């Protein structure tokens, strides 16, 4: 069976990464239920960022970042029903120089547990290099190993001349376009204090040969208990459309810690049979205190 775009299990964790710049309302949710009313309240920005965009062609913005730092490490269980099928790790092991810019190296790995690998073995590796100042990517790598399926993809993003050079071709990109990993780290710099249920904001994400738009709905706030603790969380939902970046048989809901760190706490997504839950089990090396943790 050939996985879609990002791979089966890898795609579940990558759904953690789908929120970014809120610049316009999503007009068509692509979901069965009615979309949120097109009101001024629902068109407000879901978050605001302390950033400065300059008008010079070769000038990059500066984004204030108190959300993450070198050394952060997040560990998750990937559960299918009552079975823990795999483990995922997101971490920032180093700061490297890419295209002459200081960049966070961010690694993301998804592995099936040995007890589940005999059914379906997963060894997925993703890597992105995110500009320390602009929180925009300069390079993205994907190495998927799922069952007999193999895929390797690399994209170099020229954030000055707005071109993506990939293993599959060269393509124009908008300013500050994201890969699926850098998008998540960008949203963590945002302030959701003024967000209201029903607010919709957008991600602009490049993959393969296309820049995709994906609407994300702010659902509200909730107290949530997982292995890593009990947290105050922000709850969001990607508005999945047929033919879009993600394809899903059902609803996807994401919980982020409701504080300056905005670390992913849980993801629930429907599959053909049942659902997959991804839950935070460990965290370390955070940029500051995790005030959303209750106990």
Predicted regions mapped to residue ranges:
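Acidic, serine/threonine-rich low-complexity disordered tracts
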Residues: 28-157, 194-295
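N-terminal processing/targeting junctions
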Residues: 11, 23-24, 88-89
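Bacterial N-terminal signal peptides that target proteins for export
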Residues: 1-12
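Hydrophobic h-region of N-terminal signal peptides that target proteins for export
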Residues: 15-23
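Hydrophobic, well-structured mid-protein blocks that either form specific transmembrane helices
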Residues: 149-191
């Amino acid at each position: 069976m050939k996985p879609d775009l990002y791979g089966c299990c890898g795609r579940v964790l990558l759904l953690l990464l789908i929120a970014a710049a809120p610049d316009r309302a999503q007009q068509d949710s692509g979901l069965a239920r009615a979309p949120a009313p097109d009101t001024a309240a629902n068109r407000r920005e879901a978050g605001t960022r302390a950033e400065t965009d300059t008008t010079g062609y070769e000038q990059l913005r500066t984004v204030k970042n108190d959300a993450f730092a070198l050394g952060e490490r997040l560990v998750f269980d990937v559960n299918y029903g009552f079975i823990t099928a795999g483990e995922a790790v997101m971490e920032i092991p180093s700061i490297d120089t890419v295209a002459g810019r200081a960049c966070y190296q961010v690694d993301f790995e998804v592995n099936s547990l040995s007890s589940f690998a005999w059914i379906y073995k997963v060894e997925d590796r993703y890597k992105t290099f995110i500009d320390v100042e602009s929180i925009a990517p300069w390079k993205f790598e994907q190495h998927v190993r799922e069952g007999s399926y193999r895929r390797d993809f690399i994209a170099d993003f020229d954030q000055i001349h707005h071109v993506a050079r990939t293993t599959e071709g060269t393509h124009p990109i908008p300013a500050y376009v994201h890969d699926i990993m850098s998008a998540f780290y960008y949203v963590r710099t945002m302030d959701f204090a003024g967000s209201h249920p029903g607010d919709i904001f957008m991600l602009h994400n490049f993959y393969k040969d296309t820049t995709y738009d994906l609407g994300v709905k702010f659902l509200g706030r909730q107290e949530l208990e997982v292995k890593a603790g009990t947290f105050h969380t922000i709850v969001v939902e990607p508005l999945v459309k047929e033919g879009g970046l993600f394809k899903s048989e059902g609803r996807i809901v994401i919980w982020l810690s409701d504080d300056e760190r905005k670390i992913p706490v849980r993801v629930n997504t429907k599959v053909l049979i049942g659902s997959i839950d991804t839950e935070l089990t460990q965290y370390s090396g955070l940029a500051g205190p995790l005030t959303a943790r209750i106990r």
